[in-house]
Amino acid sequence: MALLVLAAHARRAGWEPRVIDQNFQKLPDEIPDLACLTVWTSIAAQAYRLADAYRAKGVPVVLGGVHASLIPIEALRHCDSVVSGEADTIFGTVLADAAAGKLQRMYKGSFQDMDAVPMNHEWADILDKWPIARYAPLNTLQTTRGCRFNCDFCSVIRINGRGSRHSPPERVIEEIKVLKKVGQHLGEFAYVFFLDDDLAADLDYCGELSEAILSSGVKVRWGAQASIGLARNTELLATATRSGLRTMFIGFEGIDRDALVECNKKNRPGEYGELVAKVHKAGAGIEGGFIFGFDSQGPDCFEETAKFVDNINVDVAHFSILTPYPGTATYARMLADDRITTFDWKRYNMYSCVFEPAKMTAAQLETGLATAYREF
C-alpha cells in the first residue's frame, strides 16, 4: 500500500508512476526514469539485486521502507538515495531532485496527520488493474499510524512513532466506498482489512469509526489488528461488530509471564480465554499471534502453547519464531550478546531461527514451530 500512496504523490508532482508488485506482476521491459523500491528485511537481498540491475542500466534508484530506513548504510551500497521513515512529506522533494539530476544520498521523512495522506481514490485505478484485484478476498485500508506500545521485537515506533495518528472517520467511509467499487466482484458486502498496527490504540477513535460506519449505511465486513483493550471493552466490541467487525488479530505473543516480560508486553494470559469468549459472543473471530524463542522457553513450550490456544478456542493461530529485526531492542540485545548467527536477511522471515536460543537449539526451535502447527 505504501507504493500506491507514493504513486499518488508522484502524480501530484506531474510524474506518470507505474506500481509493480512482484508477487503478482513481472517487471516491465521499459526502462524507467527513476526506480523506487520499498525494502523489508526478508526481501532485502532481492531488492538489492533489483536495485543493482537498474543502476547497471543507468537508472537512478531510491530505496525506502523499514529495512532501508533502519540500516541505511547497507542500503546506500545499492542505490543513489535512501528515504528514511514515512516518505509522504519528503517524496515531492525526492522527485524534484531526481528530475534535476541532483538526488541527495539521504532523505528523512517526518510524521504528518493522516488526513494529509492521499486518499485511495487517487490510486484506486492502479489497484484495479492489478491481477490481485480480480481474485483477492479482501481490500486494505490504513486509518492510523503509530503504536502506543513498545514491544522489544517490533520496529513500528522507530518508523511511525509512539502514539496514534488517525484519519477522520468520514474520510475512512469515503475510502471504504472506493474499495467497494474496486472490489465489485466481492458482492454487496465487501471485506476490508485495516492495516493499522493497532486499531484499538485509541479506543475513543475506534468507537467513533465504528459508529460512523453504522450511521453511514455502508455495508462492509472488516477485520483489524487490535490490542486486547478492544476485547475488554464490551460496549465498544458490540458497536464494532454491529458495524461489520468479523475478524480481530490479537498479538497474544506468549502464554507465560516471563516471556511477556522479556518482550515488554503487558498481556495477562489468565484472561485470554475470557476475552476470546467475549469476542465470539459479540460475533467476531479471533486470529492469535504467538511467538516462540524467548529465553524463558524450553522445548516443551510448543505443545503447551498449542494445547492452550486450542483450549481457549482461538479460531486461527499464527505461530512464529522470535526474529531480531534490525532497529528493535531484541536485535540490539542479541547483537550485544553475540547471539545472532546469520545476517542472511531472507532467513529473517519469522519461520527460521537466526540466533542462539537460551534453552534449546535452533533446530529444536524450528522443528517445534512445525509441531505447534500440527498440534493446533
Q: Which residues does each PLM region occupy?
A:
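Structured beta->alpha junctions
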Residues: 39, 43, 67, 83, ...
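Structural detector of well-ordered beta-strand residues that form the stable sheet scaffold
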Residues: 62-63, 83, 223, 287, ...
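Short amphipathic alpha-helical segments and helix-helix/interface helices
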Residues: 7, 48-52, 72-73, 95, ...
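Acidic, low-complexity intrinsically disordered segments
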Residues: 1-184, 359, 364
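C-terminal accessory regions of radical SAM enzymes
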Residues: 303, 307-316, 323-376
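Short, hinge-like loop/turn segments at secondary-structure boundaries
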Residues: 36, 78-82, 100-101, 240, ...
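Structural recognition of alpha->loop->beta junctions
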Residues: 74-92, 239-248, 304-319
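Radical SAM [4Fe-4S] cluster-binding motif and immediate context
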Residues: 121-289, 294, 303-307
